[in-house]
């Protein structure tokens, strides 16, 4: 693609929209954690051999699976447990070698009291899988050089409490359905859990856990169809969350609508989002609980499309200081509050001072969450560049010295952390993180020479990798890290378009 051509950018963006409309699930990368769970719980499901092969192929040279540092713990536990479950049944030598190196990595690369990343249900899933692996090791007749148990802490107190609720046929929080696989036998066909469209919590692993082992009755047809469809999307491996259709619609619309790309957004996009909005807002996709992050993003997308809806559904998430994503959540989200501020700012000047006051209050809270070096961090993404792009966009919607200074600090941090090849990234330069960094720089109305040079170098990196999804590793938080593929493509294309004017200004300045 000639990425310097605005027409080519627009055509690529239109392709994303057209693909999105045709796909009811949303496109996310396959998950090591989730695929391993399916190896254990659904060996009867089509694609089992391919799922085992996927696990073997995804192991890193150091024996781990998944993301860097502590992000690798959960997927490594899940993969080791899964491969122990198939030991001796498929490609025995490779499986045994993968298990041995995986166990060595668990012993040598993760301290006993490792600080866990704030991924979904990590406080339930890690203790559960430590328990599972320990049980498998203890049952082995001939372990050889394998350890008898893992030297990792496994506090299963919270997990046991939720399991007991299921045993007593007491309802559990709907957000827990997404990780139902950790709850064991009480989860099988639990009457307190209701599949939607065949899916439990938009998760293949949770759906399989609810179904249980064959034989399955006719009542399970929708769930079986869901599992067959989700495994077919990647040829056996599965994504950790399916569907994310509302999330994908809202984020893609926002990324493209603010870029100057005149893409054709069909009327069914706002229709879908408006229909999904309820008294509590909407969720990332069907079968998930409503949350304020997806709700505020959808409200902003609808505003951009000229189809504004009331933001009153957001008030129930308001704590008086900041907004929660879900009721009774463990940690607040900076990116969510930034999205809410933007949605509230869309309504400023319309006669209801609640919007103005809430936007100012949330803006003050966001300023307090900013790190001393100028970045923000967030619980929905591994990279500070995502949170900082969200925070900067929120700061740009407010007036006043505090928010202006916060935006300046964010810009300064971005300029200070650019890599030599023009990219940005927490661990390595990625297209996604480079797009976020450029978005931050684009908030300065009249960038100085260093900022213009940084934008030029960043655009050059993006232009060279715009069609290379390999430069977009999983960074988003689910149970493990994942990539929302179309969202990232839209962010990159939209950023290239939105920064074209500044790139031309930098070129003129050098002439």
Swiss-Prot record:
Optimum pH is 5.5. A divalent metal cation binds at residues 291, 293. It is an enzyme of class 5 (isomerase). Its cofactor is a divalent metal cation. Pfam families: SQHop_cyclase_C. Keywords: Antibiotic biosynthesis, Isomerase, Metal-binding. Pathway: Antibiotic biosynthesis. It catalyses: (2E,6E,10E)-geranylgeranyl diphosphate = ent-copalyl diphosphate. One of its GO terms (biological process) is antibiotic biosynthetic process. Activity is highest with Mg(2+). Can also use Zn(2+), Co(2+), Mn(2+) and Ni(2+). It comes from the Bacteria. A motif (DXDD motif) lies at residues 291-294. Optimum temperature is 35 degrees Celsius. Homodimer. Belongs to the terpene synthase family. PANTHER family: (E,E)-GERANYLLINALOOL SYNTHASE (PTHR31739:SF25), ENT-COPALYL DIPHOSPHATE SYNTHASE, CHLOROPLASTIC (PTHR31739). Involved in viguiepinol biosynthesis. Catalyzes the conversion of geranylgeranyl diphosphate (GGDP) into copalyl diphosphate (ent-CDP). This is Ent-copalyl diphosphate synthase. It comes from Streptomyces sp. (strain KO-3988). The lineage of its organism: Bacteria, Bacillati, Actinomycetota, Actinomycetes, Kitasatosporales.
